[in-house]
Design a protein with these regions (language model features):
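Catalytic Walker B motif of ABC-type/P-loop ATPase nucleotide-binding domains
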Residues: 134-137
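Helix N-cap at the start of a conserved alpha-helix in ABC-type nucleotide-binding domains
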Residues: 145-147
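Helix-to-loop junction immediately C-terminal to a conserved catalytic motif
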Residues: 25
Length: 180
């Protein structure tokens, strides 16, 4: 996949889609073959280097939005600043909040948000660290059709606008139209 492309891996439950993502994201090693991210062969890297590459180059969007329940949206982002430096600048962050439609939710906690809002915050978290790759594991699974399409519109828009490579794994064939 190239920068600015959104691609999907589609298959039935149990077909290995999530396993593929954990391997592509450097969380698991392949039994054969290799994953190369920006010239780095993941299987050749020691765990510490692989973790560093993962933090710098990969943003994850999970099926369950994976937000910390006791932190507001704004605090979720600040926590990322403690783990990784050189995240989006304030003006870029403000633009991202607006483009994802979460600018007015910054002081809200996950329990105050709808499923679609939580997924938009999860996308914001994945984009905030400015990775080159977004890996999304069934990002629309818990959403109704309208919200699922909204999330895919946002992922596609963010992919194009920010020149990211986005890989979505899903069993939902309705999402094919969003892919390159």
């Amino acid at each position: 996949a190239e920068a600015g492309e959104l691609i999907a891996v589609i298959g039935p439950s149990g077909s290995g889609k999530s396993t593929f993502l954990t391997i592509a994201g450097g969380l698991q090693s392949p039994s054969s073959g290799d994953v190369i991210i920006n010239g780095n062969h993941l299987s050749a890297l020691k765990e510490k280097k692989r973790a560093s590459l993962r933090l710098k180059e990969i943003g994850f969007v999970l099926q369950s939005s994976n937000l910390i329940p006791f932190l507001s949206v704004k605090q979720q982002m600040r926590l990322l600043d403690k783990v990784k430096k050189d995240n989006l600048k304030k003006d870029q962050l403000k633009d991202m909040y607006e483009s994802l439609g979460i600018g007015d939710l910054l002081n809200s906690f996950p329990s105050d948000l709808s499923g679609g809002q939580r997924q938009r915050v999860a996308i914001a978290k994945a984009l905030y660290t400015d990775p080159s790759i977004i890996l999304a594991d069934e990002p629309t699974a818990s959403l109704d059709s309208d919200r699922a399409f909204e999330v895919m519109d946002l992922l596609k828009s963010a992919t194009k606008k920010n020149r990211k490579t986005t890989i979505v794994v899903t069993h939902d064939t309705r999402l094919i139209d969003y892919c390159d």
